[in-house]
């Protein structure tokens, strides 16, 4: 089996990533060994090092894999047009749907927090963060968004409202609201707090 995978670099790499993602999400970066990944993927440790170089680089590839689709959606939405209340709400919905449809991403984020990992180590996340801050700062300069708040704090609040939908269920039972309804309410709270005229 290993000999066949050595002749199939793409298949080997995919098998390693699949096994690494499953183990990292189950045990975290610190709790997962390269030997365990090699065993689960059916390859040698040397082949993992050949494809990824190190455990840290493999972890980075897993994080990139989890965020690629979300990154592409957000860049397509935000990079080609100015930020408006309409596009900001669409961005919020994309984030909500990504976490809803990919629960492994939220699990990954918790492991990153527990392991003391810096989100900025993921270039896709860093690019989106920089893009969001840049868009917010531009609207502050135009008088569209409140200028008395730091753009980084505004972006954190934006993301936090969506995180709460998935992390606060143990504390607050919401029987009377649909997922779409939650995003609408989260948007109303955010827009009324930061946009000078949220109806634009």
Identify the role of each PLM range.
Residues 1-11, 18, 199-200:
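N-terminal intrinsically disordered/low-complexity leader segments
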Residues 11, 15, 19, 23-57, ...:
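Helix-turn-helix
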Residues 17, 59, 63, 67, ...:
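Amphipathic, non-transmembrane alpha-helical scaffold segments
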Residues 60-91, 132, 138:
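Amphipathic alpha-helical linker/stalk segments
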Residues 75-103, 151-158, 200:
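Hydrophobic alpha-helical connector segments
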Residues 93-100, 110-115, 189-194:
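Helix-loop "lid/cap" segments that line or gate small-molecule binding pockets
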Residues 106-107, 111, 122, 126, ...:
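Hydrophobic/aromatic-rich alpha-helical bundle segments in the mid-to-C-terminal region
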């Amino acid at each position: 089996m290993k000999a066949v995978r050595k002749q199939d670099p793409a298949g080997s790499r995919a098998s390693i990533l699949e096994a690494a993602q499953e183990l990292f999400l189950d045990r975290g970066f610190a709790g997962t060994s390269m030997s365990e990944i090699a065993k689960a993927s059916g390859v040698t440790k040397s082949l993992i090092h050949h494809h990824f170089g190190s455990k840290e680089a493999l972890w980075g590839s897993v994080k990139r894999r989890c965020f690629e689709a979300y990154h592409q959606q957000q860049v397509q939405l935000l990079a080609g047009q100015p930020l408006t209340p309409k596009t900001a709400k669409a961005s919020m919905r994309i984030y909500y749907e990504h976490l809803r449809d990919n629960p492994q991403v939220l699990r990954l984020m918790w492991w990153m927090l527990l392991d003391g990992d810096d989100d900025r180590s993921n270039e896709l996340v860093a690019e989106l963060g920089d893009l969001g801050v840049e868009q917010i700062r531009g609207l502050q300069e135009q008088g569209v968004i409140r200028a008395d708040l730091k753009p980084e704090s505004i972006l954190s609040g934006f993301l936090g409202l969506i995180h709460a939908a998935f992390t606060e269920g143990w504390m607050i039972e919401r029987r009377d609201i649909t997922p779409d309804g939650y995003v609408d309410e989260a948007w109303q709270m955010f827009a009324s707090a930061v946009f000078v005229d949220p109806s634009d």
